[in-house]
């Protein structure tokens, strides 16, 4: 049955995991902050302190184990309420909600986190807008059996435009809060991994 086990259970076992990574000699550790843990519905005025406390502890533990935290701000987890209420990134209101989230996080971890990724595989939404950008007409009765079919090319490009505006705002805001921040988006390849024939760079 789906979700019948705990997977790696990182939420409860991250201290053990980070000790193992330290033993392996890692000098950085990439993880994600779930937007919905900080703003459960996504459009609240005030953040969820319990959610922030988890990331306080996680980031401190990464640093304690001698690793540089590399934080992804969005990794395919747009809060469900934003999808249901606004259609996800189709709505320009998402830019305002996103700004509140990233400002909260940048201020909270100023001086602790230097390396930031805005959107994981930001260009993946062109192929899979529902997963990558939370784009869905979830309440459209015409598509009750397959809501993904309701997504039009215009929806996709509108959402992508809003995400790119939010991405630019993230870079600007992050540098305003801490000029030492290094911020960029993660890109995905064409969908097919390719590897060289051998390790010779020529």
Question: PLM ranges: what are they?
Answer:
Residues 1-14, 18, 22-27, 39-202:
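Non-catalytic scaffold segments within catalytic domains of secreted glycoside hydrolases
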Residues 33-37:
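Active-site gating/metal-coordination segments in enzymes
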